[in-house]
Amino acid sequence: MKEPVSSIQAPSRHAKIDFTRQWQNFVLGFQHLLAMYSGDVLVPLLIGHYLHFSTLQMTYLVSIDIFMCGVATLLQLKRTPLTGIGLPVVLGCAVQAVTPLETIGGKLGITYMYGAVIAAGIFVFLIAGFFARLKKFFPPVVTGSLITIIGFTLVPVGFQDLGGGTPTAASFGDPANLLIGFLTIAIILLFNAFARGFMKSIAILLGLLISSFIAGALGFVSLKPVSEAAWFHAPQLFFFGVPRFDMSAMITMILVSLTTMIESTGVFFALSDITGRQLTTNDLERGYRAEGIAAILGGLFNTFPYSTFSENVGVLKMSGVKSRQPVYYAAFLLLLLGLLPKVGALATVIPEPVLGGAMIVMFGMVGVQGVQILHKVDFSNNANLLTASVSIGLGLGITMYPQLFQHMPTEFQIILGNGIVVTSLSAVLLNLLFNHRWANHD
């Protein structure tokens, strides 16, 4: 008589455990969402304002962007024979594309802007196999340098938000901004140091929420974006018109896509190191293809190219949860928020100092992940020492002074004005020079 009772009770117990785990995954996914949300919606806002979009156009642009972030993320999460790297990666608008797209849209028109995005997506899809085979040129001295520079060059973005967002504004650096920003950092650190289990893994989310409530009590939160947003918005093909194509615009966006592929490579290797999963050439190929398809869909639905978000590497590192399940929840939440702009607008009311404090922690974690990879490198070998030091030095310098190449053609500025790209190119070339060519002559 006891055996049937036990067979009935066991499923109930397992169902409860599964429900708890799924709830925790949902909350972790929400943490991933908040980490990338403001950085993502910034891209359509910047481009829309530059091109003088109407309120209706801006509403569509932000909504479809959020929706397509969910689509792009799902493309990467699920490994298929064609696409998907299968790592816990979140995709968002490629911020490197902002200035080129503004230039194309301003000079040629909106439809040419989307034609260039589609062309860049097709290019990424077609060269995915070739680019993936360059994996052998990314040993730890190269990937470590690249991931270090990705993290540390983005830390100033966090400080800018912590100060209030716009350095030229009179309120920038206001003591209230600094108090809220550093309070966010303190809350994240306290939960990470003293909390246990699940509460520790959502330290960033708790820091964002608690600091936002405090900031709201101090009058830093405005719900105007929520009241102005529509309740529902459906994705629509060719909302701004059928894409048109111009050779110079397409070449410009293809160059931008190369820079995003290089940055994505760094993020892929960072996630590989965190999760302990070795990446194959086929993995990388599927990952690049997913980004190519996401860009093509972006052009068709009149939005933008998409790339991996390094913020979420910091979230993953901090939480210690390496599963893809939370990111699936983040992707589905993005789809939902893209359809319900009024709900999605809630995430935009988080004050900039709060986001800045969280960004400093997240980007710092990404940089330290790169340092951990460099720890595996034999620096008693001067070739490795020179490769890392020169590459990181060039990346930091160009990040501080991107105008260094302002007198060069635009095509060169896109490549050489990006510290992450320069670090990657420098590390690959110096590693080949020192560790291969010269080694063969010893």
Located regions from the model:
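Membrane-embedded alpha-helical modules
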Residues: I104-S222, A331, L336-H441
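Juxtamembrane interface elements at the cytosolic ends of transmembrane helices
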Residues: K2-Q9, D40-P44, G48, T184-F194, ...
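Hydrophobic, small-residue-rich membrane helices and short re-entrant helix-turn-helix hairpins
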Residues: F194-L206, W231-F240, A249, G266-R289, ...
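Short, non-helical or kinked segments that cap or interrupt transmembrane helices
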Residues: Y60, L82-V95, K136-S145, M199-L205, ...
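Membrane-embedded helical hairpins/re-entrant loop segments and their flanking transmembrane helices
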Residues: R13, Q22, G48-G84, T252-R324
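Intrinsically disordered, low-complexity non-transmembrane regions of multi-pass membrane transporters
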Residues: M1-L28, L223-F238, D273-R277, G287, ...
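Hydrophobic, membrane-embedded alpha-helices of multi-pass small-molecule transporters
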Residues: W23-M36, D40, G173-I185, I202-A203, ...
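N-terminal signal-anchor module of multipass membrane proteins
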Residues: K2-V89, Q96-I104
